A protein has these predicted regions:
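Hydrophobic/aromatic beta-strand patches that form the interior of the parallel beta-sheet core
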Residues: 36, 90, 140-142, 182
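Amphipathic alpha-helical segments at domain termini/boundaries
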Residues: 12, 26, 30, 69-88, ...
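Rossmann-like NAD(P)-binding element
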Residues: 40-47, 58-116, 124-125
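Rossmann-fold NAD(P)-binding glycine/threonine-rich loop
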Residues: 102-153, 158-171
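NAD(P)+-binding Rossmann beta1-loop-alpha1 motif at the extreme N-terminus of oxidoreductases
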Residues: 1-55, 62
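Internal alpha-helical scaffold of NAD(P)-dependent oxidoreductase catalytic cores
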Residues: 31, 135, 156-187, 193-224
Length: 224
């Protein structure tokens, strides 16, 4: 369990179980959370199990929560069923608008209004992803760096409809489980981390506040 200011997070739904999603699942397990994983691939369950087993030795070296266990997860092929009972949802489906928009629409209908849905997307516009969600205010980008179970940096980006409370909850949750969340200004933009040279040039020309944030990025081990 992770206790935040306003809520407690016990169960996380990880929707999309490729490299990023499976790595997220391992990381959440290492911090004592119950995890439900969903992915449509026929061999997804076995791949997730192998990924968690492979990641666990490194997570042990980094330090496990007292309640951590590599066995506290279950698999549901249907994303709506996987989301049932979740206190936080981390979506990591393929980077295609048609896939993510439909998936997020389904998750938005399945989850209670107060549950934050964070997308791992790095290159899609958050405001476009929100277009078909009834509760768009609870949708945010929570973009990890690869692999998420090792690299601590997470970029948090809100869309035009994202509520401030959603940003606060996502930032607090990531921080509580050992991540280093960095917030980008709410906009229709994508994340900046994978485009460091272009982003740094722009950030440094935009004023002192952005310069300070930009300097923090390399400290969290930007990948090549």
């Amino acid at each position: 369990m992770v206790k935040l200011t306003e809520i407690e997070i016990r169960r996380v739904a990880v929707i999309g179980a490729g490299t990023i999603g499976a790595s997220w699942a391992a990381y959440f397990l290492a911090h004592g959370l119950d995890v439900t994983v969903s992915d449509p691939a026929p061999d997804a369950r076995d791949k997730v199990a192998r990924h968690i087993d492979g990641a666990w030795p490194a997570l042990e070296k980094l330090g496990l929560a007292p309640e951590a266990s590599p066995d506290r997860w279950r698999f549901q092929a249907d994303p709506s069923a996987a989301a049932d009972g979740a206190d936080f949802c981390q979506e990591s489906a393929p980077e295609r608008y048609e896939i993510k928009i439909e998936l997020l629409r389904r998750l938005d209908r399945a989850l209670p209004r107060e549950v934050v849905i964070a997308s791992s997307s790095s290159g899609l516009l958050i405001s476009r992803l929100q277009e078909h969600c009834n509760y768009a205010e609870r949708l945010v980008i929570g973009h990890p760096f690869n692999p998420p179970h090792i690299v601590p940096l997470v970029e948090v980006v809100g869309g035009f409809k994202t509520a401030q409370a959603t940003i606060v909850t996502a930032m607090e949750f990531y921080r509580a489980i050992g991540k280093h969340p960095r917030r980008d200004a709410p906009s229709g933009s994508t994340t900046v981390g994978w485009r460091p040279l272009r982003a740094w040039c722009w950030q440094f020309s935009a004023g002192s506040d952005r310069r300070r944030r930009c300097r923090r990025l390399p400290r969290c081990r930007l990948p090549p």
